[in-house]
């Protein structure tokens, strides 16, 4: 199952000077394959596309950012929408 994750933090909690955006997720979370990361840095928002079978695995992936971010997890279709 694919998930689109929108992770947002405030400017005051920005990780830029504290290890960067890589400190906001666990790349070794069991059961999660990270497919893409995109940033809207002026908005303090990071977007992830991950593949996982269980939501608990996605939550473990996001655990490092729980104290400084909010996250919206949305299941998405594996089939692209093309006109």
Regions found by a protein language model. Give the residues of each.
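Conserved, structured core segments of small domains
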Residues: 1-83
